[in-house]
Amino acid sequence: MGRRPARCYRYCKNKPYPKSRFCRGVPDPKIRIFDLGRKKATVEDFPLCVHLVSDEYEQLSSEALEAGRICCNKYLVKYCGKDQFHIRMRLHPFHVIRINKMLSCAGADRLQTGMRGAFGKPQGTVARVRIGQPIMSVRSSDRYKAQVIEALRRAKFKFPGRQKIYVSKKWGFTKYERERYEELRDDNRLEPDGCNVKYRPEHGPIAAWEKAQRDVYA
């Protein structure tokens, strides 16, 4: 028996049903790599960030996520080079889908019970995605903006439903917009932390604090 088409599991009808001690025998998801490209590039290397955002409330199979990842990666490797981008998959397939197998051969009615005991066996995993939730994000240099958008446009064809491509106003994968990031960086308030940054709050030495207290209460 072949794999049941993913269109049968497209909509979020049931509650989340993750793998657990009650839900055993779940096959491994097809997607195993969620970060690829130049993952260790510093936050300064890749200021551009582009998101592929879902425009529907639906379920995406792990096979579709893997196909989209491969499609995006192949295009960027060919037209940008393998060290000029960092792709991050933003969805993880945790929801388990079930199948109630039915026999279709002659005399099947003697062997099976139809819809009696119809709670199926685990068949695969899908990711539940909301409207406005990013499916995948790419950070790169500004000179490769057109190539990144085209790679995500091609990856859209691997997913059901509608998606939109957003060019983020933020610096890379950080939470700061570009102007704000440059201000904080010039003030030495940011500390690089892999592909992100840590904010250094205004904590002075204790002597400076004591002096300020004396000035206030003098």
UniProtKB/Swiss-Prot annotation:
A GO molecular function for this record? structural constituent of ribosome
A Pfam family found in this protein is Ribosomal_L16
Q: Has the keyword Ribosomal protein been applied to this entry?
A: yes
Q: Which GO terms describe its biological process?
A: cytoplasmic translation; translation
One CC-aspect GO term? cytoplasm
Q: Does the keyword rRNA-binding apply?
A: no
Keywords for the protein's UniProt record, in alphabetical order: Ribonucleoprotein, Ribosomal protein
Annotated PANTHER family: 60S RIBOSOMAL PROTEIN L10
Cite the record's note on assembly: Component of the large ribosomal subunit. Mature ribosomes consist of a small (40S) and a large (60S) subunit. The 40S subunit contains about 33 different proteins and 1 molecule of RNA (18S). The 60S subunit contains about 49 different proteins and 3 molecules of RNA (28S, 5.8S and 5S).
Similarity remark: Belongs to the universal ribosomal protein uL16 family.
Q: What is this protein called?
A: Large ribosomal subunit protein uL16
- Per the UniProt record, the source organism is Drosophila melanogaster
